[in-house]
Amino acid sequence: MGNKKILAVLCCMALMAGCGNVSKESETSNIGNIKKEDIVSISQGSFEYADGFSGINDLSENSEAVIYGEVLSVKYIVGENGLCRTNLEVKVLQSLKGDFHTGDTVKVAKDQGITSIKDYIDSFADEEMKEVNREDFSEYSDDELEKLYIEQIGENDIMSEVGQKSILFLRKSAFYEEEQTYSRLNGPEGEYTEVSEDQFVNTQTLGGELKPPYTLDDYED
């Protein structure tokens, strides 16, 4: 099966603007069984943020919490009009700013996710939009729609995985009242992924970094 690549400019940032209804969401089941070849469409979002940050000190000053953590679990959710997000449980390995302590579990939400084509289509309330989206995947039968998937991810971001370690610059997400989740400051700009022991690279520059990696000592508040 060919893999469709779609560039999507998502004007409504779910985690920042809260443009979603939690009661109308569905969770992707059996995510551990999803194979790479089952993902037939990748939608890459281009997000615009009001402010940029000059570096880790600027990010830290504007964050409610900064943690070095490890992903314990991953949950994919699709909301209204096909907007996906990922809810993570992250174990705090070291607290660099804020009220969290080593061993705490933090809920982190990201603007990315994987959903079945069926759930994606069903998430649209407008019948005309359902028909348009069904036509986009007309080469697949109704049965196949339940077993094939769409991936959504922000530009210059990476998909989260269990065991992944990173430094996260956090603030309360738009879903905090319902789910007590935090989100990264400016998406991938607010995350530094551990590429080797105590070596961290900004997530949005992974693979093309021009600066040497940071260490935990560089993040002392």
Write out the residue ranges for each language-model feature.
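Conserved hydrophobic positions within beta-strands
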Residues: 69-71
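Short, conserved beta-turn/loop elements at beta-strand boundaries and strand-helix junctions
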Residues: 73-79, 96-98
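N-terminal, intrinsically disordered, polar/charged segments of Gram-positive cell-envelope systems
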Residues: 8, 21-62
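Bacterial N-terminal signal peptides that target proteins for export
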Residues: 1-7
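Short aromatic-glycine-enriched beta-strand elements
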Residues: 77-91
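Netrin-like (NTR/C345C) domain of secreted extracellular proteins
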Residues: 20-37, 112-221
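C-terminal motif of bacterial Sec signal peptides marking the signal peptidase cleavage site
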Residues: 15-18
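Extracytoplasmic
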Residues: 51, 62-66, 83-87, 101-105, ...
